[in-house]
């Protein structure tokens, strides 16, 4: 480290050793921002044509995705697999998962703060006007379990 002030962005487990040694510090994370706690910021998307033509494929994908997320948070063996794959300790793998990727943040069935998201889309000029309930229903299609 150069003893200069620098700001960066990182995704754990990168940087955890430096945090532990006191070489760097976390001054804020996305989990600290109230705006992110009140709205969904991660989604899985496809286009309408692909969804229409391959709906069964997407349904199977979502089933597997949900099973994988459940496994990641329920079975300690998942931490060992991740730790071995990344080359870190199981403790660090658990810290990465629990501290930086809370289960609810990767839940594909959880959409929160839709009113705020729609208003932000207009304010930030992603869309000219708020979407109607029918448009939102067409846009957000969560496959059944």
Can you describe what each PLM-predicted range is?
Residues 17-20, 44, 99, 120, ...:
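Preference for short coil/turn "hinge" residues that link or interrupt alpha-helices
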Residues 29, 93, 131-132:
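Residue-level detector of family-conserved "landmark" positions at structurally sensitive sites
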Residues 46, 53, 108, 138-144:
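Generic structural "secondary-structure junction" signal
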Residues 52-127:
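Secondary-structure end/capping motifs
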């Amino acid at each position: 480290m150069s003893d200069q002030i620098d700001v960066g962005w990182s995704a754990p487990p990168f940087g955890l050793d430096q945090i532990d040694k006191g070489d760097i510090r976390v001054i804020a994370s996305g989990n600290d921002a109230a705006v992110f706690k009140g709205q969904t910021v991660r989604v899985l998307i496809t286009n309408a044509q692909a969804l229409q033509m391959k709906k069964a494929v997407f349904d199977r994908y979502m089933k597997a995705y949900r099973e994988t997320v459940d496994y990641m948070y329920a079975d300690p063996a998942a931490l060992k697999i991740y730790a071995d794959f990344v080359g870190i300790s199981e403790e660090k793998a658990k810290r990465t998962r629990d501290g930086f990727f809370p289960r609810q943040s990767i839940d594909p069935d959880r959409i929160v703060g839709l009113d705020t998201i729609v208003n932000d889309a207009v304010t930030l000029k992603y869309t000219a006007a708020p979407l109607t309930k029918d448009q939102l229903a067409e846009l957000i299609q969560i496959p059944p379990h």
